[in-house]
Amino acid sequence: YIPIFYLIAYAFNAGEDMNRFTGFSLSHFQNLFEDSRLILILVQTFFLAFLSSLIATLIGTFGAIYIYQARKKYQDAFLSINNILMVAPDVMIGASFLILFTTAKFQLGFLSVLASHVAFSIPIVVLMILPRLKEMNDDMIKAAYDLGASQLQMLKEIMLPYLTPAIIAGYFMAFTYSLDDFAEIG
């Protein structure tokens, strides 16, 4: 951690180099926040992370429910497909999406980056929600159906409230993962 503390201390250095501490100053931070291009990149990065995490959480939640309700032999196949993006290196995934988008003549920009971030965030959400689904008591679902609940009512009244902590955790994991793999757009 020494290099991190060193950088933090010298961020407040009035001098222009990191050889000698010449006095306390916030000028480097002032220069940082005066750079409008950097602020724009920061805003775009957080917006992209927010939006991609939201979409990935919606898709990943219903994907996890689908995997959970699938037959055992299909569950393994779906989980294997889901895990491909988790084990593949980020550079390979990025290059694959670039090839896909250019081959499909999809314009590169915010939407292509958003689609890529959603695609590599979905597996994280699925992996956060599936364990919670497996902990769920199947008798609650059966009881809801026995009492006349429709599939939508069971989902809304039983399953989603039970999954809420895992859904929130999945969202924040996807958000963090998206922030980690930020991209400059435009």
What are the residue ranges of the model-derived segments?
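Membrane-helix interface segments
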Residues: R37, Q69-F78, K105-L111, Q151, ...
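Membrane-interfacial helix termini and adjacent extracytoplasmic/periplasmic loops
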Residues: L26, V91-F120, L152, I185
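Transmembrane alpha-helices
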Residues: Y1-I4, V126-I129, N137-D138, Q151-D180
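Residue-level signature of the transmembrane alpha-helical core
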Residues: L42, F46, F50, L54, ...
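Cytoplasmic-entry segments and transmembrane alpha-helices of multi-pass inner-membrane transporters
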Residues: F62-F97, I141
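Transmembrane alpha-helix signature in integral membrane proteins
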Residues: F12, S36-I67
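Hydrophobic alpha-helical transmembrane segments in multi-pass membrane proteins
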Residues: L48-G60, D90, G94, I124, ...
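Short membrane-interfacial helix/loop motifs at transmembrane-helix boundaries
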Residues: I2-S36, G186
